[in-house]
Amino acid sequence: MSETFFHLLGPGTQPNDDSFSMNPLPITCQVNDEPSMAALEQCAHSPQVIALLNELQHQLSERQPPLGEVLAVDLLNLNADDRHFINTLLGEGEVSVRIQQADDSESEIQEAIFCGLWRVRRRRGEKLLEDKLEAGCAPLALWQAATQNLLPTDSLLPPPIDGLMNGLPLAHELLAHVRNPDAQPHSINLTQLPISEADRLFLSRLCGPGNIQIRTIGYGESYINATGLRHVWHLRCTDTLKGPLLESYEICPIPEVVLAAPEDLVDSAQRLSEVCQWLAEAAPT
């Protein structure tokens, strides 16, 4: 058989197409992973910290907390070795939260690589006030802080400014949904609207600053800031290659992208059980 046929196709056999392009794969994609068992083997730890993990795993296997509730174990009194062991085991997942509390303390919350498990630490200055491991759709401090903001009144509307296009009707739409919980969740997608910088400034003045900042990672990054209005969040999604992807106002108790799904909690309970079993088998006798 002639070899000519086999040279009609393949690399280098076709003319270049200058118009061809391919979107590069996102370089910011991160997914949950298993804890490094090799690293855990090198971490000294006490039976106390293993008992805490077993307690949380048992609670989670018996009962999945409903929205607004969590299961928790206290880590505040762990020694330095146990704290390092917990840090190695939990790692860092996709969601980070920072909350400025009314008493001038600050809550720092990091989702673990076990989706729906949250490391919750509260500090005042250099002093650590709380250190907990929580299991739930969202950490308790976030649920509590998200319901403390103001409800709107008509007097909240800031005076009009030059350059407004859609700011005023968007403000009325936003306030109408905040006042009516049955109309939530609701999203106002600024990316798909003709909107000016004056509109953005007007809406920002309407909502005011909040005390919660959230960052999520995955395909790009999302920055979600609470506003001064209850259940109103300003969301910006970016991609390191393409820049801004989405800007919106979300009217809801907590944006869905932050929440762990029930099936995530089931999976994390199973994975945590496997880790606890491995630790028990690896323990010296």
From Swiss-Prot:
Keywords: Nickel. Pfam families: HupH_C. Residues 1-21 are annotated as: Disordered. It comes from the Bacteria. Belongs to the HupH/HyaF family. Not known. Could enhance the incorporation of nickel to the hydrogenase. This is Hydrogenase-1 operon protein HyaF. The lineage of its organism: Bacteria, Pseudomonadati, Pseudomonadota, Gammaproteobacteria, Enterobacterales.
